Regions:
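S-adenosylmethionine/decaboxylated-SAM
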Residues: 2-212
């Protein structure tokens, strides 16, 4: 469970990822948009391993070219190779499937059936337009009872992008879990808002319903 600490990158969604590990069933599918060098991916897979859920497939989607100002001063040229090294064991076991592409690539979107994904993690391009597109494109892929989460909701671009993407599906609220940088979550369930209030694992981290 500690190998992720040796991997460079930004990762503050431990509680979000542990909720996914807790509720996903063995054999289901997870999609992670934006993985950088694999710090968060390593944490997720090690958590699934610890939980005995060895048949979960995790699809990671990343251009490995970075996006926006958050990567402006980072040398990303070796990032793909570093990711592959950091996750080699899980890749060899075919528990991680790597898609080197944009998250709005139509062929990738078409490869996932509607209502087929247990969890979608959005942590790619943080511009409002990109977040809106990711939320809008990937929400239909989330199965009933599944969850969509995204990082850095403290950024107005992420918050507004999330609202706008869900609004296009007729959804007017989202759970905001307040931590160091904050993350959003939406569960596909008739009692989504009530269930969202339970997304709290770390003492001092509170969740609340926000309306777009």
């Amino acid at each position: 469970m500690y190998k992720y600490l040796d991997i460079p990158g930004w990762f503050n969604m431990h509680d979000a990822y542990m909720n996914i590990v807790k509720y996903v069933d063995d054999g289901q599918t997870i999609v992670e948009i934006g993985c950088f060098a694999g710090r968060s991916t390593r944490f997720l897979l090690d958590g699934l391993d610890y939980a005995g859920k060895h048949k979960v497939k995790v699809h990671v989607i990343d251009t490995f070219e970075g996006s926006g100002m958050e990567h402006a001063k980072v040398n990303l040229s070796p990032m793909y190779d570093e990711f592959m090294r950091n996750l080699d064991d899980y890749i060899q076991d075919e528990r991680i499937i790597v898609h080197v592409n944009r998250s709005d690539n139509q062929n990738i979107l078409d490869s996932f059936a509607t209502n087929s994904v247990a969890a979608v993690i959005i942590d790619g391009d943080h511009t409002m337009e990109a977040v809106e597109k990711d939320v809008y494109n990937w929400w239909p892929k989330v199965m009933e009872g599944g969850i969509m989460v995204g990082d850095d909701v403290r950024l107005d671009s992420v918050k507004q992008g999330c609202y706008k993407g869900l609004a296009k599906h007729g959804i007017d609220s989202v759970t905001h879990v307040r931590g160091e940088e904050g993350w959003f979550a939406k569960i596909k369930h008739p009692d989504a808002d009530k269930l969202g209030e339970q997304l709290k694992l770390i003492p001092g981290v509170n969740s609340m319903k926000l309306n777009g």
